[in-house]
Amino acid sequence: MKKNSQIRAKIIELREKIEKWNHHYYQLQNPLVDDLVYDKTLRELEKLERENFFLFSLEELNQSPSQKVGSKITSKFEKVAHSSPMLSLNKAYSNEELEKWAKKAREILKTVTFFVEPKIDGIALSLFYQNGNLIKALTRGDGVFGENVLVNALKINDEFIPKKINYLEDLEVRGEIYIDNSTFASLQLETKKFKNPRNAASGILRRYKNHKPKIDAKSIKFLEEESDFRYLKSFFYTLVNPEKHKINSQFDSINFLRNLGFQVNPFQKKCSDLKDVFNFISIIKQKRDFLNYNIDGVVVKVNEFSIYEKLGSTSKFPHSAIAFKFEDDIAKTKLLAIFATIGRTGKVTYNAKIEPVTLAGSKISSAILPNYSYIENLKLNLNTEVYIKKAGEIIPQIIGSVHNYPKTNFSIVKNCPKCNSELVNSESGLDQFCQNQFCPEIILQKIVHFCSKNALNIESLAQKRIEKFLEKGLISSACDIFYLKDKLELIYERLSNKNQLLTKQNASQSMQIKSIMKLLNEVERAKNIDFYRLIFGLGIRNVGLKAAKILSRYASNLSELRNLDFNLLKNQHDFGPVIIESLIDYFNNQKNSEQLNCLETVGFNFKTTFLTNQSNSWASFAISGKLSKPRDEYVRIIEESGASFHESVTKKTDFLLLGQSAGSKIEKAKKAGIKIINEVQFFDLIKNSKKT
């Protein structure tokens, strides 16, 4: 009896935990744990409930989060019933589990085939059309009722949410709304409010007009802009009631949706058998880090709709589809220590030392923890077991504790670990900063960034050598690098071995001096760079490569940049108030002004060919499909020719550059009368543009 009461208490504890996680995930767009930790906990609950169902009444079992989808709707949007339940998907973590799922379908239809595509980590949305017009847009909600976010869906680009379609029958389609990774990075959302692209997409899509979320002032400014909706993209994958439209398979339904102008994932396949399914899953797994959107597994569907009714469903998921999850990206290890480091902007990052463990083919001994709130939320405890995950990052991230603890046993760091200055919290309260402009670590990291590959690309100035130069008093700022040539004797003296004093006569024989001469040559070459590289190298908070390139269109040198009215960039080129404020703060700072004064004396010969005014662009390009070179290379060629590049096909697009496996952009271009060109025609256009 005592054992039964303990098991019942454990089940109740797991239910409460999952209910809390569901509320934060579905309603607050603020997931408390990683998906893999959530899935493991849910599976533990399901197993305990199966083995101990007799401990609960039928009503209690039906109320368990293991039997429900989503969470209770708490927003101010209209609550609308779904035409058919918007179910979740059951999960498989191995080939054996996938085979077990497919067995029932093969028993019903021996020639069954399957349809496989990536599982997009976004926000589920159901669209309704009457007489070709979009009339309703429902979120998943609790699976039975959803929120009607039509007012916001209408603001999304037509390419991703068609407002009118060439089809007059009543139609319902379901898909996923997301923000791609490069857009998310350029928006500098980071940990200001949204932890990842999914949270950002949900926050924008579910924004209520008269409701301001409780976030920092900068994020509120960002969220209040109507233009935010242009960042949302989509993939559609479900045609509801396909028999009404005489569609017999998932493969045919995808083609049907594509022909109507809906975005469908081009990375998909109809598979003849499970062997084909397993092979395609392996391909997706290998390529997922190169996709520009997050996926949290693969969806495998029975292709033939004719057996869906016989396959049936539970209250939570259909038996006609399953989500295959990549579990080998998670590992269990011991958290040994946590320590703080300071970046070039003064931001504090918490780092974890862990017991070495093999993850995704490499041995891992450290992991990253974004901020102290992250440590608090996960209730991480030193010298206890934790889960770590690797998802494209070089350093993996701790995503949860193996065991439950009431709170963390690690105290927040209050002083800078390098200069001991008191740390200051950001407006959001999530991040901490060292605001001492003379902090040696901030100075070091600024110079490291200045010399990095995407900035001035001075390979001979790696972090260890910069540390040595700072220690010996040879430099104190990034600009000092350009005057090292005037300090050769001092360099010889301060970097020489005390037991073997170097002189000018024997300097040429020294490998160390040869290395220094190589460094000086690299520094000279760094004077002949694209202007955007120097802008990026300045290390202005929130200004990445994309923003730096755009700024170089409005200013051709430092003097012009310093006198630029940054408010002119508002609502242009994805420049929101956060970036504008960062630019103004940077150029109003006295220490930064001294650095810029120094850099203006260096004698740069900028190679940039970007237009100073985007409106003077001679042509506008979009790209679809796989080309012979990386896409970034074509974007560079387009911009340097004086043309403009856009991710989407719009009425203002002049040319669509077409590669292999092109997506739905080709149909959009044809309908809009946009000229479609291949690579040979593209380079001819670029060549001819230089003659005019």
Curated annotation (Swiss-Prot):
Q: Does the keyword Ligase apply?
A: yes
The residues responsible for catalysis, as annotated, are: 119 (n6-amp-lysine intermediate)
Q: Which UniProt keywords apply?
A: DNA damage, DNA repair, DNA replication, Ligase, Magnesium, Manganese, Metal-binding, NAD, Zinc
A Pfam cross-reference name: DNA_ligase_OB
KW Nucleus (keyword) present: no
Name the residues that bind Zn(2+): 416, 419, 434, 439
Superkingdom of origin organism: Bacteria
Q: Which residues bind NAD(+)?
A: 35-39, 88-89, 117, 140, 176, 301, 325
Catalytic activity reported: NAD(+) + (deoxyribonucleotide)n-3'-hydroxyl + 5'-phospho-(deoxyribonucleotide)m = (deoxyribonucleotide)n+m + AMP + beta-nicotinamide D-nucleotide
List the cofactors: Mg(2+); Mn(2+)
UniProt cross-references to NCBIfam families, sorted A to Z:
dnlj, PRK07956.1
Q: What does this protein do?
A: DNA ligase that catalyzes the formation of phosphodiester linkages between 5'-phosphoryl and 3'-hydroxyl groups in double-stranded DNA using NAD as a coenzyme and as the energy source for the reaction. It is essential for DNA replication and repair of damaged DNA.
**Name of the protein this chain belongs to:** DNA ligase
What organism does this protein naturally occur in? Mesomycoplasma hyopneumoniae (strain 7448)
Q: What is the lineage of its organism?
A: Bacteria, Bacillati, Mycoplasmatota, Mycoplasmoidales, Metamycoplasmataceae
Q: Which gene encodes it?
A: ligA
